[in-house]
């Protein structure tokens, strides 16, 4: 999680530098409430110090943003989460960057909007100190949130309500890492404040014109550390130490709109922890060790479909794919990717992402750099 925190710091610096160029600002406060769920169900089902299910979660948010042209905004926010079980889980505080924009205008004062948040959450109680907490093993965890909202606008006031989903986890850097999800509703009120500086666009020296119908290509290299698991005689063991995950994604895009791209990606991946179970050593009493798998069981080549929302400074990408060249059960099945690209220059970007398997199992972080080739 140290690498993720460093990456978040760089993203916050990029946002802070661009804030100085904007003339309109936005202050907001909101509440979120919903149903918490996790693949590891014991804590939420009532095996905790309270002796009752944890079936309600709530959060309060405060945000500062600068307003971009064309009804969009981005900035920095804080969120405080409660599962109403501070003893076992803690009351974590999240620091995040966010971006929102209009999807459709319904009338002069009503619209459908979206907003995403990405950051880090601090203050979780760790599993080794609080054994009832079977969902989190680190005090700092990633925070990802997305919302679709019905918004009412006046000259300087905005009120929004809509469905909301949140995910917390440590990127499989420690175990347990079941993570926590929350689905529910949010209510936000925002006020627009006029600034004193002239309005300019962030990175306006490199912003592209509308390239609808054009082609581009992103090449991303990434690496991260993760924990490995071993199944032996129907028991699950956590392998000692950490393992490397790395790769290169070669991703051509077709630009449907200057703010939306679709494409395919050739995903070349290396996972040092893959297929450890096939090389486990033990006896009737349990696991005693393992042999490192051969390289051919640790590398894979896959194809994935990608969709990307492109905004000033940031791009948010979603992908779903399947390995086509691989060996071993751990590299089979579908994988999913969600990633945030922070554009440093016209072509260079920071890549901060997360890969899942089969829509539910955390796999590893995708921390790296990428280069965009335009007009291919």
Task: Give residue spans per PLM region.
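Residues that define the transmembrane beta-barrel architecture of outer-membrane proteins
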Residues: 25, 54-60, 89-95, 110, ...
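Repeated loop/turn-to-beta-strand initiation elements of outer-membrane beta-barrel proteins
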Residues: 25-27, 37, 69, 107, ...
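Short glycine/proline- and aromatic-enriched beta-strand/turn motifs that initiate or cap beta-hairpins
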Residues: 23-66, 200-251, 372-376
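Outer-membrane beta-barrel "beta-signal"
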Residues: 36, 181-202, 362-376
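Transmembrane beta-strands of outer-membrane beta-barrel pores
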Residues: 33-37, 80-84, 118-126, 154, ...
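Transmembrane beta-strands of outer-membrane beta-barrel proteins
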Residues: 25-29, 72-76, 112-118, 159-161, ...
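Bacterial Sec-dependent N-terminal signal peptides
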Residues: 1-29, 110, 152, 157, ...
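Residues on the lipid-exposed face of transmembrane beta-strands in outer-membrane beta-barrel proteins
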Residues: 60-66, 95-103, 116-120, 144-152, ...
């Amino acid at each position: 999680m140290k690498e993720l925190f460093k990456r978040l710091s760089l993203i916050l610096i990029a946002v802070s530098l661009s804030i100085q160029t904007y003339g309109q600002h936005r202050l907001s406060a909101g509440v979120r409430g919903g149903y918490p769920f996790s693949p590891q169900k014991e804590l939420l089902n009532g095996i905790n110090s309270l002796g009752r299910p944890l079936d309600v979660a709530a959060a309060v948010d405060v945000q500062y943003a600068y307003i971009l042209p064309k009804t969009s905004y981005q900035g920095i926010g804080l969120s405080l989460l409660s599962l109403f079980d501070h003893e076992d889980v803690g009351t974590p505080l999240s620091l995040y960057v966010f971006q929102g924009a209009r999807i459709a205008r319904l009338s002069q004062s009503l619209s459908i909007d979206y907003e995403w948040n990405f950051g880090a959450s601090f203050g979780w109680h760790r599993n080794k100190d609080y054994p009832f907490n079977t969902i989190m093993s680190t005090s700092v965890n990633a925070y990802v949130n997305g919302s679709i909202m019905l918004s009412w606008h006046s000259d300087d006031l905005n009120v929004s309500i809509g469905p909301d989903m949140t995910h917390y986890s440590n990127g499989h850097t420690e175990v347990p890492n079941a993570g926590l999800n929350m689905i529910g509703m949010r209510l936000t009120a925002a006020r627009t404040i006029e600034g004193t500086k002239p309005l300019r666009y962030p990175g306006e020296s490199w912003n592209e014109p509308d390239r609808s119908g054009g082609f581009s290509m992103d090449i991303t290299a990434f690496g991260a550390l993760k924990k490995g698991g071993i199944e032996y005689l129907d028991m699950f063991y956590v392998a000692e130490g950490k393992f490397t995950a790395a790769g290169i994604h070669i991703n051509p895009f077709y630009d449907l709109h200057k703010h939306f791209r679709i494409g395919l990606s050739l995903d070349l991946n290396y996972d040092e922890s893959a297929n450890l179970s096939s090389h486990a050593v033990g006896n009737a009493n349990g696991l005693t060790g393992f042999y490192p798998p051969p390289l051919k069981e640790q590398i894979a080549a896959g194809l994935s479909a990608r969709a990307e929302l492109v905004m000033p400074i940031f791009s948010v990408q979603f992908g779903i794919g399947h390995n086509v060249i691989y060996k071993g059960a751990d590299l089979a099945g579908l994988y999913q990717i969600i990633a945030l690209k922070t554009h440093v220059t016209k072509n260079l970007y920071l890549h901060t992402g997360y890969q899942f398997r089969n829509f539910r199992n955390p796999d590893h972080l995708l921390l790296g750099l990428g280069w965009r080739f335009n007009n291919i």
